[in-house]
């Protein structure tokens, strides 16, 4: 497994980020950069540069979820991903911390 760096993800294999976060409160009802409405149940992830709709699989403590890029962000230095509330709930990872991921399903 490779440790990820902030920036453009690479295809192939599992990667680990030290710090992934989630977002939602205060933004529900707003439009995302990819044309959806952010809700508590929207399954997706924000990334700074991946095309909208790109599938990303996240894995945490035996659970996994595959979600599309639905928004832009995160806007905190050193972070690559921001899960939506729906995605973090399904994954059991609604906090800031480490996670594994790979591009695709």
Q: Where do the PLM segments sit?
A:
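Secreted/periplasmic proteins
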Residues: 1-105
């Amino acid at each position: 497994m490779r440790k990820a760096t902030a920036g453009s993800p690479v295809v192939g294999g599992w990667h680990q980020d030290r710090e992934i976060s989630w977002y939602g409160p205060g933004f529900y009802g707003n439009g995302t950069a990819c044309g959806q409405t952010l809700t508590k149940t929207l399954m997706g992830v924000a990334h700074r540069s991946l095309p909208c709709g790109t599938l990303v699989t996240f894995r945490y403590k035996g659970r996994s979820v595959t979600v599309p890029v639905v928004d832009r962000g995160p806007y905190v230095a050193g972070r690559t991903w921001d899960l939506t509330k729906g995605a973090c709930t399904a994954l059991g990872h609604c906090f800031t911390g480490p996670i594994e991921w790979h591009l695709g399903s």
